[in-house]
Structures are given as structure tokens and as C-alpha cells.
Amino acid sequence: MLVTRDPITADGALLLKTYHCVEDRLSGAGLRLVAEVAANKVVVSFPLRVMNGRAAVFTRPHNDALSRLADERGWAVRRARLSTEEFVDVDKERGGTEH
């Protein structure tokens, strides 16, 4: 059966170039998605440039909001950066912010 009432859980969830789109449509929805997704680790990515090549100005506020959420919940946060994207790894099982 493809439909079940049992919750689906995962070790990790990838929100690649998704968080900022959800958050822009409904304030708080991105944070809620990270908080409520049934996964111990959530990796969120943000593009560093928008489609026209300009710097993405939304990355910093979203990163700050994720850090506040992690602090409130006692989750660990690690960050990584490539030339085109920034990644935020939220670990719901480990406490404290890492760099």
C-alpha cells in the first residue's frame, strides 16, 4: 500500500535551493519546514547569486533566522560554502552551534 498513516522519518532531509522560496511565499514557513520535517539532520542550501548574476541579498537574513531557531531548540549548526552556494547543516540530535 502506498498510502500509510504512519509518519515517514528519515536520517536526513535536503532542502536544496528550497528554503528561501518557501520563506518568501509565507513568512515563517521555511523555519517551520526545518523544525517539523521528520529528520535528524536538515541541510539547507542558499544560492549566492540570483538568476541575473547579482549577489543574493536574502542569504544572510535566512541564515540568521536558522541560527536563532537552532539556538532556541538546542540544535547544532555547521556551515559550508562553495563558489555558488552556501550550506547550513542543522543537526537536531547534537546541541550547540559549530562553525
From Swiss-Prot:
In terms of InterPro entries, this protein maps to: rRNA_MeTrfase (IPR025981), SAM-dependent_MTases_sf (IPR029063)
Task: Please identify the protein, giving its name as recorded.
Answer: Uncharacterized 10.9 kDa protein in fmrO 5'region
Q: What's the source species for this entry? A: Micromonospora olivasterospora
